[in-house]
Amino acid sequence: MATDRRRVLPVLLLVAVVAGGLAAIPRQDDYAGARRRMIEEIRARRDVTDPAVLAALEAVPRHLFVPEKERRNSYEDRPLSIGLGQTISQPYMVALMTSLLGVHRGQRVLEIGTGSGYQAAVLSRMGVEVYSIEIVKRLGERARRTLSEQGYHKVHLRIGDGYEGWPSAAPFDGIIVTAAPPRIPDPLLSQLKTGARMVIPVGNSYQDLWVLTRRRDGGFDRRRVLPVLFVPMTGEAQKRER
């Protein structure tokens, strides 16, 4: 069947223009592919195998938790600046710490150091109720806005010093700390349920990631996981070091 070339040519030109414009703009599908590649890289390291953790990381749009200028790098396995001297942890570290926490749907977790809100979003995606504290007001307000816009309504965010934890909401099924104090804050230990874990980086120039599990007798089993580098915990933690 013959075709009128005069009608086809404008259509082809329009398609070419639209396609050319879209090529310059990252699409949601592009980010989805980048997330899948990020998950494949994490799986390849073989120390994060929890399907719920990996599914949450694949579902949460990390690019929406970083500044616009960092979005092209948002699924690379490295920390990124979120401004005000703070960073968003590398995806592998988020996966590892979440896996070490060992929490499940319906449980409650205290997070010290909301930052961008990404770690809280991952936990919320797993069905965990999150209580998160951020000491930097502007970061906390930005994270609250992002979490609300993305529909993460099981995150309770408070702006303040996280050293004392959140006593009125304690005890928790897990505590995750995303800034390094010189030593482990005793108030946080007291807010763990029996059998619950705290995952925390500890140290000054040299830091290690630790997992502490509360025993029935009130003591703690302590396990050092690996050397890490986190931003320091500010506020009361720094005052007590002087």
Where are the model-predicted features located?
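Class I SAM-dependent transferase core
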Residues: 22-110, 121-122, 126, 139-141, ...
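N-terminal secretory signal peptides that target proteins for export/translocation
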Residues: 1-4
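Positively charged
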Residues: 174, 239-242
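Bacterial Sec-dependent signal peptides at the C-terminal "C-region" and cleavage site
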Residues: 7-29
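Conserved nucleotide-cofactor-binding alpha/beta core module
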Residues: 102-221
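Generic hydrophobic-segment detector
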Residues: 10-11, 75, 96, 133, ...
